[in-house]
Amino acid sequence: MERARPEPPPPPPPPPRQPPRPTPPRPLRPAPPAQPVEAATFRAAAAERSQSPSAQATAAMAAVASSCGEAAAAGAQAAGTRRLLQVKPEQVLLLPPGGPGVPPAPDEGAAAAAAAAAAAASSAQARLLQLRPELLLLPPQSAADGGPCRPELHPMQPRTLLVKAEKQELGAGLDLSVGSRRTTEAGPRASRAAKLDGTGKALDGRRSDEKKAKLEAEEAPRDALKGGEGKSLLAIGEGVIKTEEPDRPRDDCRLGTEATSNGLVHSSKEAILAQPPSAFGPHQQDLRFPLTLHTVPPGARIQFQGPPPSELIRLSKVPLTPVPIKMQSLLEPSVKIETKDVPLTVLPSDAGIPDTPFSKDRNGHVKRPMNAFMVWARIHRPALAKANPAANNAEISVQLGLEWNKLSEEQKKPYYDEAQKIKEKHREEFPGWVYQPRPGKRKRFPLSVSNVFSGTTQNIISTNPTTIYPYRSPTYSVVIPGLQNTITHPVGEAPPAIQLPTPAVQRPSPITLFQPSVSSTGPVAVPPPSLTPRPSLPPQRFSGPSQTDIHRLPSGSSRSVKRSTPGSLESTTRIPAGASTAHARFATSPIQPPKEYASVSTCPRSTPIPPATPIPHSHVYQPPPLGHPATLFGTPPRFSFHHPYFLPGPHYFPSSTCPYSRPPFGYGNFPSSMPECLGYYEDRYQKHEAIFSALNRDYPFRDYPDEHTHSEDSRSCESMDGPPYYSSHGHGGEEYLNAMPTLDIGALENVFTAPASAPSGVQQVNVTDSDEEEEEKVLRNL
């Protein structure tokens, strides 16, 4: 006999529930204090409805607006699935009650996207709407509890979001048994997520508990909203999600039994979006509601999670009209030249050209022999010019070139033969002739000293024929012709005095002038100047330095003072700080073998002299980088007086005119004994620029005929061999500076405004207009 199984105890009956009835509106509980998230706060409340097979129709309304404290009107209370919405002012997410969790749609320009919770086993799709203040969305009207849906406008204040989730009240004949509940859990990034409170297992229409959630706008794209089948929620009533400003008092939000307003009215950051309750039925598998757009600006967008209806997207193609660009050949003349009736193949034998036409010009200059095109153009130019009297000579030449290119090789052959005959006759007539283009026509400078010095000369070297000092760095140096032992110091900072020995015998030797540039350099040979014995300053200005002063110089900055002749003397000139940067003028006497070189100190008295440090290869001031010769001296020079041939400016000295552009004349890496002298151009002497500004470019040293220079050694007074002298010259230079007498400006004006004498084959330096008596006094004092 089969044993009877013990029956399991029956489940406890559900607590009795009162039939649902309409409830009057009542005020809500005060919401907890909200936390601001980007000037907007969120308070979330969710509710869960009892799920019965026949009670799955719900209505949800999400209102996204800028609140002014007034809440939107609420629909009838009903059981519905909880939804947790996080929205921004331009996005609204519409969810069906039972569907899988829909991930938020990506939005590039949005900081947060809408997120939704899934509750029931429905496959309806959610809609994500991207709204703008000028967008109006009106879904078709549908009945809610038999009543028509009426759009409702809620004026709101900006910077406040109002989101409401409502559930319609269940009918009286619906089953009120409690089914499986689903909870909505916030993701791990929602730190202050939902706080759920439950007090019972039945859903009461009049009593409900609130679920409070606080959401942050940036955490919305990563918040996962999950629905659990095995989790039950106790007695959750109506759910309200509301946000408002933290510092604004909250107005009452009342839930009524009237029909829920369906539709969307968007005006001035105000959006109310609702779905009819029939849209969320259990048999509604796809949400396809038509939308009506009103007043959509070009910047407004509507973004759907699913495929949007095709009628919402209208693309218009803007026709691009191509603009014709008229291209005119540069070789074509501007005036239309008629060549129709002009014969262009006249043979040279028929033209009557002389054997060697125009071999010389008026000045007797031998011209080049004509080539084939010149022979052809000379024949046909008169006929073409006669047919086109309105065309000028340039236009005729352009047309002749075009017509010559149109000829075939056979048509050109007679002219090539004629050009060869002319060339042979020209060679017989002028056997040693070599073509040399005139620099004037090709805009080249002649090989003259004045044009060489008019550029930005950086290194001037005058040597004997056996010694050539190549360019190594930006320096200013002068080597006196015929010197075997010389002295050297740079113009770098300021020497106490510039002393130069004289050659033992005054003999003519070439002066090699280097014009360095980036591409190449070239020397220019110039006959040496014969200097007249005129001192630059009165005799009382001269005082010879003692040998102890010279030998007391530090080793790192010492100069080797060597005399080329036993009787040669050195003389220095002292000058005050006001005229410290004036030119150093040489005055040599070709009468006697001992020759004196008077010079001017280039250090201002106000300049502090640091102690000497033996740095053999360093710059007190770094020289500027080498560039084009026109840019080597972009800054104004620091000389108070500029020799006109040392003046900076956009002078161009072509390297092609200098025949010696290859080593050893080109610059490169050379020994370090070359003095570094460009520190003289540094900022320390800028303040002395304005002292003699009235004399700049005004003294008559540059206006010489025959393009000769008179005093090219006025800028720098040092030779090439010997250790370089740097700016720190110690106490020896201090004695030179302390004994400087004062010199008035008028004396210097007389010096530099002296009238120039008539130049001859030998260059002269006329520095002052002192007489012979002063010369004798100077020689006696020295």
Swiss-Prot record:
Consequence of gene loss (knockout):
Knockout mice are viable, morphologically normal, but males are sterile. Male mice exhibit small testes and epididymis. Multinuclear syncytia present in the seminiferous tubules, with degenerated multi-chromocenter round spermatids and multinucleated giant cells in the epididymis lumen. Increased numbers of apoptotic cells in the testes and epididymis. Increased expression of CTNNB1, MYC, CCND1, and MMP7 in lung cells. Increase in diplotene spermatocytes in the testes, indicative of defects in the later stages of meiosis.
What are this entry's molecular-function GO terms? beta-catenin binding; DNA-binding transcription activator activity, RNA polymerase II-specific; DNA-binding transcription factor activity; DNA-binding transcription repressor activity, RNA polymerase II-specific; RNA polymerase II cis-regulatory region sequence-specific DNA binding
Q: Where is the composition biased (Polar residues)?
A: 512-522, 555-574
Enumerate the subcellular locations listed in this protein's record, separating them with semicolons.
Nucleus; Cytoplasm
Keyword Repressor appears in the UniProt entry: yes
User: What spans are recorded as compositionally biased (Basic and acidic residues)?
Assistant: 203-226, 704-718
Q: Residue ranges of the DNA-binding region?
A: 366-434
Record has DNA-binding as a keyword: yes
InterPro entries on file: HMG_box_dom, HMG_box_dom_sf, SOX30_TF
Biological process, per Gene Ontology: negative regulation of transcription by RNA polymerase II; negative regulation of Wnt signaling pathway; positive regulation of transcription by RNA polymerase II; proacrosomal vesicle fusion; response to corticosteroid; spermatid development
What Pfam families does the record point to? HMG_box
Tissue distribution of the protein: Expressed in the lung (at protein level). Expressed in testes (at protein level). Expressed in preleptotene spermatocytes, round spermatids, and elongated spermatids in the testis (at protein level). Expressed in pachytene spermatocytes during stages 3 to 8 of spermatogenesis (at protein level). Increased expression in diplotene spermatocytes at stage 9-11 and in metaphase spermatocytes or secondary spermatocytes at stage 12. Expressed in ovaries.
Compositionally biased intervals (Pro residues):
7-35, 97-106, 525-538
Please give the residue ranges the record annotates as the region Disordered: 1-37, 95-117, 139-226, 501-604, 704-724, 756-782
Expression induction per the record is: Induced in germline stem cells by retinoic acid.
Q: Which UniProt keywords apply?
A: Activator, Cytoplasm, DNA-binding, Nucleus, Repressor, Transcription, Transcription regulation
Q: Can you tell which superkingdom this protein's organism belongs to?
A: Eukaryota
Task: Show the GO cellular component annotation of the record.
Answer: chromocenter; cytoplasm; cytosol; nucleoplasm; nucleus
Query: Its function?
Result: Acts both as a transcriptional activator and a repressor. Binds to the DNA sequence 5'-ACAAT-3' and shows a preference for guanine residues surrounding this core motif. Binds to its own promoter and activates its own transcription. Required to activate the expression of postmeiotic genes involved in spermiogenesis. Binds to the promoter region of CTNNB1 and represses its transcription which leads to inhibition of Wnt signaling. Also inhibits Wnt signaling by binding to the CTNNB1 protein, preventing interaction of CTNNB1 with TCF7L2/TCF4.
Quaternary organization: Interacts with CTNNB1, competitively inhibiting CTNNB1-TCF7L2/TCF4 interaction.
Protein name stated in the entry: Transcription factor SOX-30
Task: Record the organism.
Answer: Mus musculus (Mouse)
